């Protein structure tokens, strides 16, 4: 007869009328009983022939592809002019006096941040914007391009100008070596890599070797480049020999040089800061490749003028035309949906390229990307704004993956010890926290995003634009990209972006200037940064509490008035060092703080209500007697694991689910097991704050017997059959708790001390978790343990009771910025379980 739920509760000793604990509890360690119960509750893992269920409520499992939804009305969020002050450390010292070693170390980590991957794979520019929304490709392309442009304007990205230079907006840092006024000229006196012959973005000409005197050759005539090309091309002139082969047989496209959708024209548009408009472009100039000396924001740079659309210079098979977008202007419309209708809407489409206020030298940066980007909703509650997702997962994959530094996540008990108090709380919102931390320019070549330009994007979409060899350079080929879809999309986008459509249709390569979210290093750096800032604030206001996890900052003070004045002082300090706060999102919590998914008050902590509601919904939808795919189980365990510390049996209750996930098997919920879990999660108990105290109760065990020392009283007992030592020690601790009621117990067993009961026989783990809930353990060495003798059957010998004080720990989220080293390996299950899984360390 299957095991009923009331019978099962009784078996687990969860009812009050259970028999004598010393007799009942050891039975739960019996393997046979555990096996029979598992069979009854269907917990062993059957190889099920019934098809697996792949969806439970909102949880999807294997073989499910969630189709993302594109929102054509997405707004691009605005980024304030974020600039973390370079003299951050100096400002902190003015605020609080000399910084501690830990604070200094953490702040130096991010000023500037560095990123050195072992290997970087470069992808073609076409992979820059991911085709994430097949039905809205053009729309997504422009919205993403606009987002990238916004980030560049906000000083968060560098724009690759040439192989060795980049431009950016905003305030420069001292480690960003600016191209000095005039250092882009040909007469390069410095022997080390300042950019010469700067054709700014296209990077067509590389710098010559030191001391080469090409300057005169360029000033002889407007056609100097044409005449001296032979001399330029000889190998003695450093690497500039590349120009000749480039002009004649273009094989690779530098960042600014794009083939049209048809591959017939190369864009050698000038990228000077004073980019000329179409009026200038359409002037008649010499059809040959002419050079002019123009004054750009970096000084006198020699640049290549764009060749006007009218003039075609045959060079091999191809023809050098200016810009794909503007070529449509001088052509006959091919249909009602020809792009030339849109291009003729405006006389002046603005510059082909924009340049930043500052130009810097960078390491060699290829015209490639290292990660793709796409847009999604900002968060489940805000679908009006978009968020840029950057996929730099290449750095976390394969055998060249970067092992990201681990950092301490505050565990639940530490958080409760620290924040469960009668303080009044408020939380601060740091806007775009990741984009505060500057990256060294040396990291730029590893973190490249961008796009290949609309023409190539469209060429990939349009099935008709198969480029045949004999078609090279024909106008028909240009119009291959015209289609009704593209026409309608561009017409709608024209309302939003106006003449920026032209700018966005050009290719671009951008590198990160601030830390991107898609790299495992970023969360670590952000956590280090905010914890150091909080440490500084705590030392400046010792009577208050400041605490942070990632970009979540909370402030606590004794009274509301006190909190308000603290808020003003801290806000002013943060603004003075360049940290941007979103003051409209400041939340005042009163005496119960909502933080990291918990509600924390003076009584302890509980999960927030929205999590409790999710759990209830999950149980409502949970099917019984149907095999559920392990991926769904993983998601269910992720949700239940978060609230497990607040239940009677804790994590051990979820062990059958963990086992099925590890074995990648389906799991069948029996009615009894579901009822058991449901009851567990319907009644949540707060996790209370630990109190300091003196340990008066000690437990010890041998495989055959147990012993307790409760004050001056000694007790002992034997087990019916020998047990594994850890199991025996756990039983002894349970007896000590039930006999004495003490919340502080001394033990010499590290497993009991860690309070992880998941490796014990299942039934025992569940029962012990409930008996020992809220108990704190103190480590006592075996030689000094007063319960050692009774456990060996010697009651006559009295060792004196130790004075063992217990001090609750706040873990590695310590109040002062002291941070012990992180253990090298945590069990795999930690990832989706809960912060509670960080073990207690013996004091």
From Swiss-Prot:
Q: List the residue ranges of the region (Terminal protein domain (TP)).
A: 1-177
SUPFAM superfamilies the record matches:
DNA/RNA polymerases (SSF56672)
UniProt KW keywords: DNA replication, DNA-binding, DNA-directed DNA polymerase, Endonuclease, Host-virus interaction, Hydrolase, Inhibition of host innate immune response by virus, Inhibition of host RLR pathway by virus, Magnesium, Metal-binding, Multifunctional enzyme, Nuclease, Nucleotidyltransferase, RNA-directed DNA polymerase, Transferase, Viral immunoevasion
- Keyword DNA-binding tagged: yes
Catalyzed chemical reaction(s): DNA(n) + a 2'-deoxyribonucleoside 5'-triphosphate = DNA(n+1) + diphosphate; Endonucleolytic cleavage to 5'-phosphomonoester
An annotated GO BP: DNA replication
In alphabetical order, the GO MF annotations are: DNA binding; DNA-directed DNA polymerase activity; metal ion binding; RNA-directed DNA polymerase activity; RNA-DNA hybrid ribonuclease activity
Region Spacer: which residues?
Answer: 178-346
Report residues binding Mg(2+): 429, 551-552
- According to the record, the residues making up region (Polymerase/reverse transcriptase domain (RT)) are 347-690
Summarize what activates or inhibits it: Activated by host HSP70 and HSP40 in vitro to be able to bind the epsilon loop of the pgRNA. Because deletion of the RNase H region renders the protein partly chaperone-independent, the chaperones may be needed indirectly to relieve occlusion of the RNA-binding site by this domain. Inhibited by several reverse-transcriptase inhibitors: Lamivudine, Adefovir and Entecavir.
Query: What exactly does this protein do?
Result: Multifunctional enzyme that converts the viral RNA genome into dsDNA in viral cytoplasmic capsids. This enzyme displays a DNA polymerase activity that can copy either DNA or RNA templates, and a ribonuclease H (RNase H) activity that cleaves the RNA strand of RNA-DNA heteroduplexes in a partially processive 3'- to 5'-endonucleasic mode. Neo-synthesized pregenomic RNA (pgRNA) are encapsidated together with the P protein, and reverse-transcribed inside the nucleocapsid.
What does the entry's domain section say?
Answer: Terminal protein domain (TP) is hepadnavirus-specific. Spacer domain is highly variable and separates the TP and RT domains. Polymerase/reverse-transcriptase domain (RT) and ribonuclease H domain (RH) are similar to retrovirus reverse transcriptase/RNase H. The polymerase/reverse transcriptase (RT) and ribonuclease H (RH) domains are structured in five subdomains: finger, palm, thumb, connection and RNase H. Within the palm subdomain, the 'primer grip' region is thought to be involved in the positioning of the primer terminus for accommodating the incoming nucleotide. The RH domain stabilizes the association of RT with primer-template.
Q: Which protein is depicted?
A: Protein P
Organism, per UniProt?
A: Hepatitis B virus genotype F1 subtype adw4 (isolate El Salvador/1116Sal/1997)
Q: Which gene encodes it?
A: P
